[in-house]
Amino acid sequence: MSKRDYYEVLSVSRDASEREIKKAYKRLAMKFHPDRNPGDKQAEANFKEVKEAYEILTDADKKAAYDQFGHAGVDPNRGGGGFGGNADFGDVFGDVFGDIFGGGRRGGGQRQAARGSDLRYNLELSLEEAVKGLTKELRIPTLAACDSCDGSGAKKGTSPTTCGTCHGQGQVQMRQGFFAVQQACPTCHGRGKIIKDPCNKCHGEGRVEKSKTLSVKIPAGVDNGDRIRLSGEGEAGEFGAPPGDLYVQVSVREHTIFVRDGNNLYCEVPISFSKAALGGEIEVPTLDGKVNLKIPAETQTGRMFRMRGKGVKSVRSHAVGDLLCKVVMETPVKLNERQKELLREFDETLTGSSSKKHSPKAEGFFDGVKKFFQDLNS
């Protein structure tokens, strides 16, 4: 008895997201769970079928194999035994080699036109743009469906015909001794169709080079490495097949003031010696404008001040980061003689017996150095 298609089992489309697959599985697993249907053999069989489909479609490698080869791609018993006298070697090797030359035979059916390629666009943003969000106009070079032949590749009023060599499969079987392998049909070049009267605009390709402009909404809070997917905005598919997707890859330029780490922002704020010693208020830049920061008296250089809620709003939640300001005490330069004299007088007031009280860190350091050399010489 042939197995049902896993997507059919879970009642989801072939392009369903992992979240949609999980949601469908949860609903069906609860419906058919043996504990809810004691003694019901059919419900038990349905539960096992749903579980099997879920395990395959939520495993990236198994899902890729299933999408490409069907149940044969995930059958652990496939390929381990010998071949019977009537075995069709084309089925076995066609599954493996078929994709290399443009798709498997899919049970003898006609070759399906290839989906359009995905595109990548590298978008550089300023920190302000990344934090606030905006709408960007992007000009994308791509392959678009030919508007003269509607993507068929054939001149208007005509249609492609099925290839007589491969009968629309896009492949022919070549036997080499014991083995049989599939290769691209030399007549239609793997397309499965022959265009006897090609379109003058696209020359039978069904697609033409074109640039299009898209308005892309960049959400607030994006960061380096974030990727935005625009479904169906990639290259047009081959001969009317679905288009690919466009992926916008975000990078953020370095800022002259702020450094971003996750949702937090960091900056260094210079303060004067007198401000650090006596305390006071200083202006600090934020992405929303200047704010005042209170500096306590006797603040040491390198001290970090946290301003809550002044960072970046997360792109994935309502959380907002903080702004962390590191104060750096600046040594005054280009002093005149009067200023130097005042500093010398001030320095004299700090020396002597009261120096430990005014500079505890310095005194502790020099006491440690003194002890180090005493121990070294003892």
UniProtKB/Swiss-Prot annotation:
It is found in: Cytoplasm. It comes from the Bacteria. The keyword Zinc-finger applies. CXXCXGXG motif repeats lie at residues 146-153, 163-170, 185-192, 199-206. Participates actively in the response to hyperosmotic and heat shock by preventing the aggregation of stress-denatured proteins and by disaggregating proteins, also in an autonomous, DnaK-independent fashion. Unfolded proteins bind initially to DnaJ; upon interaction with the DnaJ-bound protein, DnaK hydrolyzes its bound ATP, resulting in the formation of a stable complex. GrpE releases ADP from DnaK; ATP binding to DnaK triggers the release of the substrate protein, thus completing the reaction cycle. GO terms for cellular component: cytoplasm. The J domain is necessary and sufficient to stimulate DnaK ATPase activity. Zinc center 1 plays an important role in the autonomous, DnaK-independent chaperone activity of DnaJ. Zinc center 2 is essential for interaction with DnaK and for DnaJ activity. NCBIfam families: DnaJ_bact, PRK10767.1. Its cofactor is Zn(2+). A zinc finger (CR-type) spans 133-211. This is Chaperone protein DnaJ. It comes from Shewanella sediminis (strain HAW-EB3). HAMAP family: DnaJ. Homodimer. Binds 2 Zn(2+) ions per monomer.
